[in-house]
Amino acid sequence: MKSFLETIRKPEVGRARSRQIRGTLIIMLFGFLLGVVQKRIDGNANIPSFLQSLDIANYFGRLSIWILLGTVLSVYAETPLRAGINTSLFFLSMIAGYYLYCHYVLGFLPKQYMMMWVAISFASFFLAQLCWYAKGRGPIAVLLSGGILGVLFAQTFNITRDFMYIIG
């Protein structure tokens, strides 16, 4: 199985473990800060005017941006295992920042909703390893890339009967 997967994409070796750990810690910090910023924007109607004009709250409120960030983290990792670790820790730290802000600043904690996102974050460990191979070569990499784009398009476009008038 290992030799078959290496025909799709071969893992990079040679990066020091301390650099890998430092990179993972930076990704976790970025995820935590992004979670806090997202909840701050979600929970506050009085945000700065430049953020209102960019409509950032609307973009970060959609699933497609998080799929894109997870895909980028996984595809640019050195190995499939590192892709899974970095992506799942990014999402778990983002959830931690988001719900710690909910609990300590806003005074509520939706536990069932939070547990759903935690389960999705754990699933991202395996999905990130799969996405890592999308940057490889051959028909399987093309199929994985097409699947990723298909999921992103399904999240981005409202494909209904009215959509058919736009595309012809």
Show the residue positions of the predicted features.
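N-terminal topogenic module of multi-pass integral membrane proteins
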Residues: 1-88
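Membrane-helix interface motif
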Residues: 36-47, 96, 100, 160-165
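Structural signature of hydrophobic alpha-helical transmembrane segments
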Residues: 52-65, 110-120, 166-167
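Transmembrane alpha-helical segments of multi-pass membrane transport proteins and ion-pumping complexes
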Residues: 27-40, 66-71, 75, 91-99, ...
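Membrane-helix boundary/juxtamembrane interface motif
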Residues: 75, 165-168
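Membrane-proximal helix-loop-helix units in multi-pass membrane proteins
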Residues: 96-163
